[in-house]
């Protein structure tokens, strides 16, 4: 039976001093419904309901504190925040447990010890073990939960473990987000127990590493998980918290298409003007996931969580592999800072997403994107979806049948071979571009082909987000994929050559092995499978780069790009190969003159890039030149396109001077 609204104060008072079992006798036998009624209760009355004299003294002390408006001195409440006596009493819903609507910082729910039954062991941590459990609500309804119990030794819980456990409770009880694991309540028994939402499908890491015959996760679903994770981490940041342990092992699958951030044992509040948390002493931390400043100084911030987000992205697309496997923890910092090494691009990861990961791994925290920006950047890097239009049975090609959904990982209009995943078989491989057509798959959120592969197109992940673009679907994409013009790989070689010749820069140190150096602009190896992202109206397309060897490409940082569907060129829906987009007759001498003028004005660009730049600007030579210079500077730096444009304007559009300015500050 649930308490009446008028007597909630009594239940709170009794629970505060661990006398909740006397709630019904005091209410029904002694008819106490208001605090002043205790003035007429004698000690023998309390004796008659079984309350001993020590308990009576505790009750009297609690009554004094309640009447004086002083909060309870119970140790749990002192740490977690107690029930405010002046709080307005609100009766619980008939289908809810004995929960009270608490002020911010108050307990969500105190659960009777007998209401929770523990089952099989799900896992264990530094200071607790997690069991599957069953929570019986006062209404009689039972719901499956996860129960985390404080690990107790022969002499009781250690002070550090108890503090960490209660700190985790205090964090979780303030959080409410669809992609953050929810705390239902706390059991004040022996041992202390947290009753949490159950994620029945286990951790994402366990799912990624599940052996056959468990099928792999679709790469499009991994992209969805990344967006959910970015939203949850943006929420934690808005709460002034740093997670410090972001990894696939701490992402739980609440359903086949939903993850939730869990394990808040290392979460700490961000403080000070610099908005960071600095460890006070040696404590265990996940070295392979940590940012350099965390390993060097013990400093954690939202920017260090962004670094961990990049490592988590790498985990997802590498099948749950351990980052920096085989590298001793004490050498990881040296690899990151001295060698400037970064984790290599996983085979299933598009260049756009890897470029985004590299941006998350910027050496300086201020250069990393925020989680709120990452949500938009991921939208820009979204993988395109298509459908098979003819059977593919060629040796070595990805097998597909008409109607199969195909997620395009890499591909561009100037190549006849693309890379993707068959949504029916979940196999990944190369296939003829003519076998797939981009088509609206019924409103799925496949707005921008995330495989805007070339580092260039990973760069679509830079800058702010545009609401209209985020809502775009495949209907916004040109049917013939002709929005992306031919972009030969020679273009990236041109960019590298341009920067070297103009700036006289020597080769930068490599990361060694297969790890790409941070922030190095790509000297691309020959690639076979460029990508096909839509191009913004004011920006020339970037060169596709695909790494077909163990040496990872070193893509540019990802940046979001703004574009609208009316700027896309049109073509036949079933077009299999890219054609030169319309926009000016290539045989027109005036048009040829403009192309040559643009090519001579921007060192390192290709003839095809100049054509695209002119078409996107309606033949305006000056605008085309400026857009190409912005594009060049964009790939050299970790700045947004808007910043690059401002820097170029400050240097009177002198690309050489602007490049030196940026490199001096990188």
Curated annotation (Swiss-Prot):
Its EC number is 2.7.10.2. Expressed in whole embryo and all adult tissues examined including liver, kidney, heart, brain, skeletal muscle and intestine. Also detected in various myeloid- and lymphoid-derived cell lines. Residues 442-589 are annotated as: Disordered. Residues 457-473 have a biased composition (Basic and acidic residues). It is found in: Membrane; Cytoplasm. The active site is at residue 245. Keywords: ATP-binding, Cytoplasm, Kinase, Membrane, Nucleotide-binding, Phosphoprotein, SH3 domain, Transferase, Tyrosine-protein kinase. The modification Phosphothreonine is found at residue 510. Interacts with the SH3 domain of PLCG1 via its Pro-rich domain. Belongs to the protein kinase superfamily. Tyr protein kinase family. May function in signaling pathways utilized broadly during fetal development and more selectively in adult tissues and in cells of the lymphohematopoietic system. Could specifically be involved in phospholipid signal transduction. Involved in negative regulation of cell growth. Has tumor suppressor properties. Plays a negative regulatory role in the Ras-MAPK pathway. This is Non-receptor tyrosine-protein kinase TNK1. It comes from Mus musculus (Mouse). The gene is Tnk1.
């Amino acid at each position: 039976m649930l308490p009446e609204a008028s007597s909630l104060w009594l239940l709170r008072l009794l629970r505060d001093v661990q006398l909740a079992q006397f709630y019904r006798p005091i209410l029904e036998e002694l008819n106490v419904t208001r605090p002043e009624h205790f003035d007429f209760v004698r000690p023998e009355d309390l004796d008659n309901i079984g309350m001993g004299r020590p308990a009576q003294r505790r009750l009297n002390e609690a009554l004094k504190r309640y009447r004086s408006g002083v909060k309870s001195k119970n140790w749990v409440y002192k740490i977690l925040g107690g029930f405010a006596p002046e709080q307005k009493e609100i009766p619980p819903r008939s289908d809810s447990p004995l929960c009270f609507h608490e002020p911010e910082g108050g307990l969500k729910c105190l659960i009777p010890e007998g209401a929770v039954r523990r089952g099989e062991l799900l896992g264990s941590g530094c200071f607790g073990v997690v069991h599957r459990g069953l929570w019986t609500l006062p209404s009689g309804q039972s719901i499956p939960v996860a129960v985390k119990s404080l690990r107790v030794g022969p002499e009781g819980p250690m002070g550090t473990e108890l503090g960490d456990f209660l700190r985790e409770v205090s964090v979780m009880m303030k959080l409410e987000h669809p992609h953050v694991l929810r705390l239902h309540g706390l059991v004040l028994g022996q041992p202390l127990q947290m009753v949490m939402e159950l994620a029945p499908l286990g951790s994402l890491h366990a799912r990624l590493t599940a052996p056959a015959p468990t099928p792999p996760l679709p790469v499009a679903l991994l992209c969805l998980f990344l967006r959910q994770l970015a939203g949850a981490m943006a929420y934690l940041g808005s709460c002034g918290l740093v997670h410090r342990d972001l990894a696939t092992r701490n992402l739980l699958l609440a359903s086949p298409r939903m993850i939730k951030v869990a394990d808040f044992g290392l979460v700490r509040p961000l403080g000070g003007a610099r908005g960071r948390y600095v460890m006070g002493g040696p404590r265990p931390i996940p070295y392979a996931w940590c940012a350099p400043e965390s390993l060097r100084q013990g400093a954690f911030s939202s920017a260090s969580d962004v670094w961990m987000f990049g490592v988590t992205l790498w985990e997802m697309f590498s099948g749950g592999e351990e980052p920096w496997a085989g590298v001793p923890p004490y050498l990881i910092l040296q690899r990151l800072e001295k060698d400037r090494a970064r984790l290599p691009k996983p085979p299933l990861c598009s260049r756009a997403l890897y470029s985004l990961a590299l941006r998350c791994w910027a050496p300086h925290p201020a250069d990393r994107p925020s989680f709120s920006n990452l949500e938009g950047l991921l939208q820009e890097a979204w993988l395109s979806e298509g459908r098979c239009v003819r059977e593919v049975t060629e040796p070595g090609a990805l097998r597909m049948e008409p109607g199969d959904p195909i997620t395009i990982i890499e591909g561009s209009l100037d190549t006849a071979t693309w890379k993707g995943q068959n949504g029916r078989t979940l196999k990944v491989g190369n296939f003829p571009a003519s076998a797939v057509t981009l088509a609206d798959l019924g409103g799925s959120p496949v707005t921008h082909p995330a495989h805007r592969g070339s580092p260039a197109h990973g760069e679509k992940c830079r800058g702010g987000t545009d609401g209209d673009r985020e809502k775009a679907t495949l209907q916004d994409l040109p049917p013939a994929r002709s929005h992306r013009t031919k972009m030969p790989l020679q273009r990236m070689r041109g960019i590298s050559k341009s920067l070297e010749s103009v700036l006289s820069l020597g080769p930068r140190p490599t990361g060694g092995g297969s790890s790409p150096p941070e922030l190095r602009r790509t000297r691309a190896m020959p690639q076979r499978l460029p990508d096909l992202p839509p191009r913004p109206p004011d920006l020339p397309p970037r060169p596709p780069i695909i790494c077909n060897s163990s040496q990872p490409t070193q893509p540019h940082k990802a940046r979001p790009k703004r574009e609208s569907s009316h700027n896309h060129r049109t073509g036949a829906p079933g077009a299999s190969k890219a054609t030169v987009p319309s926009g000016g007759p290539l045989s027109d001498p005036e048009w040829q003159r403009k192309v040559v003028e643009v090519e001579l004005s921007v060192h390192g660009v290709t003839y095809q890039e100049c054509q695209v730049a002119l078409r996107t600007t309606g033949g305006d030579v000056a605008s085309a030149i400026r857009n190409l210079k912005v594009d060049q500077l964009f790939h050299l730096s970790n700045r947004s396109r808007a910043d690059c444009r401002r820097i170029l304007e400050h240097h009177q559009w002198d690309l050489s001077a602007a490049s030196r300015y940026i490199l001096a500050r990188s």
